[in-house]
């Protein structure tokens, strides 16, 4: 049986949910890895679905420095889109690929501690690792947890957590290898070329130049945080080429490596 050190933590973005072929390829790859004894934990966002649901309810999407602002009146819709629809779409794709999965959120199993991140962002949470028991049990059965980024404070208040940050915390919790998957192949330079490797100093310089901004800035900073915490590189790669994941599981580099 695999140990915690072999857990592959895959964070997938909302764009994947709109690409049936991409989901199928990714889940087929995950199924093959699980059959080979690799433990896989999936963490997801769902920004596109959230935007659609808010618009359908006559509400506006507001972002501050790349992070979604979550007013209290939007929380039920955001929770439904992430912990409900997005989670079950991914679970359906996993089931179709023959994976036994457990749909969950950050609020389940006493997994994380949650608090308000910044009052300016409304009900946006910041989480820290708490108890790995629930996740370890699911993984030990050869099942794949599919975790949404909805958390809960001790008083029962739901919070919306950035999915990259959620994946970072869960990777810390299980001592796993983190891969941030999006619809781009990695971090691109000012000319649109892939940057194979970056460290903290280089990231700071590219942020200053405006090359890394908005959503990618959040993604890269989350990757840098976990790389420094765990003392190992974190990958930023594309789900469009799921075969990259097999290479990654073998220890080969794909996408952009964020160095500690």
Curated annotation (Swiss-Prot):
Q: Which GO terms describe its molecular function?
A: acetylglutamate kinase activity; ATP binding
Q: Could you tell me which Pfam families the record lists for this protein? A: AA_kinase
Q: Which residues bind substrate?
A: 46-47, 68, 160
Supply one GO BP term: L-arginine biosynthetic process
Q: What keywords are annotated for this sequence in UniProt?
A: Amino-acid biosynthesis, Arginine biosynthesis, ATP-binding, Cytoplasm, Kinase, Nucleotide-binding, Transferase
Kindly indicate whether the keyword Transmembrane belongs to this entry.
no
Where in or outside the cell it occurs: the entry states: Cytoplasm
Q: In which pathway does it act?
A: Amino-acid biosynthesis; L-arginine biosynthesis; N(2)-acetyl-L-ornithine from L-glutamate: step 2/4
Which residues are annotated as site, described as Transition state stabilizer? 11, 219
Q: What GO cellular component is one of the record's annotations? A: cytoplasm
> What reactions does this protein catalyze?
N-acetyl-L-glutamate + ATP = N-acetyl-L-glutamyl 5-phosphate + ADP
| Family recorded in the similarity comment | Belongs to the acetylglutamate kinase family. ArgB subfamily.
Its biological purpose is as follows: Catalyzes the ATP-dependent phosphorylation of N-acetyl-L-glutamate.
Name of the protein in question: Acetylglutamate kinase
Species lineage, top-down?
A: Bacteria, Pseudomonadati, Pseudomonadota, Gammaproteobacteria, Alteromonadales
């Amino acid at each position: 049986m695999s140990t915690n050190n072999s857990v592959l933590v895959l964070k997938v973005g909302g764009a994947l949910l709109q690409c049936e072929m991409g989901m199928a390829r990714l889940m087929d790859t995950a199924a093959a890895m699980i059959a080979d004894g690799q433990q896989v934990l999936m963490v997801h966002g769902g920004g596109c679905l959230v935007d659609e649901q808010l618009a359908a309810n006559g509400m506006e999407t507001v972002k501050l420095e790349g992070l979604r602002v979550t007013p209290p009146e939007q929380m039920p819709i955001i929770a439904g889109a992430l912990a409900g629809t997005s989670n079950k779409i991914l679970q359906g794709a996993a089931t179709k690929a023959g994976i036994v999965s457990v749909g969950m959120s950050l609020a389940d199993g006493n997994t994380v501690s949650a608090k308000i991140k910044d009052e300016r962002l409304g009900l946006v949470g910041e989480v820290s690792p708490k108890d790995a028991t629930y996740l370890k049990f699911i993984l030990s059965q050869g099942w794949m947890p599919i975790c949404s980024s909805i958390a809960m404070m001790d008083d029962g208040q739901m919070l919306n957590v950035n999915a990259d940050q959620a994946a970072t915390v869960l990777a810390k919790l299980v001592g796993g290898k983190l891969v941030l998957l999006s619809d781009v192949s990695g971090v691109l330079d000012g000319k649109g070329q892939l940057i194979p490797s970056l460290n903290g100093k280089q990231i700071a310089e590219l942020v200053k130049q405006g090359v890394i901004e908005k959503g990618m800035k959040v993604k890269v900073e989350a990757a840098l945080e976990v790389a420094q915490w765990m003392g190992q590189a974190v990958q930023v790669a594309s789900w469009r080429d799921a075969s990259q994941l097999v290479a990654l599981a073998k220890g080969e580099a794909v996408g952009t490596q964020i160095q500690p």
